[in-house]
């Protein structure tokens, strides 16, 4: 959309998109919060707190009454339903931005299958993937190498646990 609006390619504009699992129903989220916290309102929310590492990810809620609640990912019925596509919007399954061929310069997202292909790169907080789609994206990546710890991976390896790339 931005590229079409600008109607020209700017050298200093890097277009980045994210690997998206989909968007859950806001109604399901509201019902979940009401079920969890009743009349207490959530004033702050962190969906993926990795402070204790990738194997102990929590959803962190701060409520208006000052209490803080940590819910482990594996124990969250909301997260399990989202991961299993129980309430991802139907339009997400028809999204024209899914797939490998993207109009961005780079795509970034979680590298869930890293352990299977590049176990030497594992760390306790998780690893992101960068998929390069353009010469500009390649140039940016090369200019950033001194700030990155990286390995070369095949797009197919990244796509295994990122179904929206398929």
State where each predicted segment sits.
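Short, glycine/charged-enriched secondary-structure capping and boundary segments
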Residues: 4-8, 30-31, 145
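A short alpha->loop->secondary-structure connector
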Residues: 5-18
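An acidic- and aromatic-residue-enriched active-site/binding cleft used to recognize and process polar
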Residues: 18-21, 50
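Short beta->alpha junction loops/turns
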Residues: 21-22, 133
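Short, charged, surface-exposed secondary-structure boundary motifs
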Residues: 22-32, 119
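Oxidoreductase and adenylate-handling cofactor-binding alpha/beta cores
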Residues: 35-36
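Long, compositionally biased charged/polar accessory segments in the mid-to-C-terminal portions
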Residues: 40-166
């Amino acid at each position: 959309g931005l590229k079409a609006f600008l109607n020209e390619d700017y050298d200093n504009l890097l277009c980045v998109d994210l690997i998206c699992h989909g968007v859950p129903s806001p109604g399901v989220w509201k019902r979940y919060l009401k079920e969890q916290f009743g009349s207490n309102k959530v004033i702050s929310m962190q969906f993926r707190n990795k402070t204790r590492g990738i194997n102990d990810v929590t959803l962190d809620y701060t409520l208006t009454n000052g209490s803080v609640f940590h819910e482990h990912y594996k124990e969250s019925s909301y997260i399990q339903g989202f991961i299993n596509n129980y309430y991802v919007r139907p339009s997400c399954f028809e999204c024209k931005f899914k797939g490998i061929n993207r109009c961005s310069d780079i795509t970034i997202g979680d590298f869930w299958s890293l352990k299977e292909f590049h176990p030497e790169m594992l760390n306790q907080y998780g690893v992101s993937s960068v998929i390069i789609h353009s010469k500009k994206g390649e140039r940016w990546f090369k200019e950033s190498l001194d700030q990155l710890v990286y390995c070369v991976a095949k797009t197919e390896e990244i796509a295994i646990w990122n179904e929206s790339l398929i």
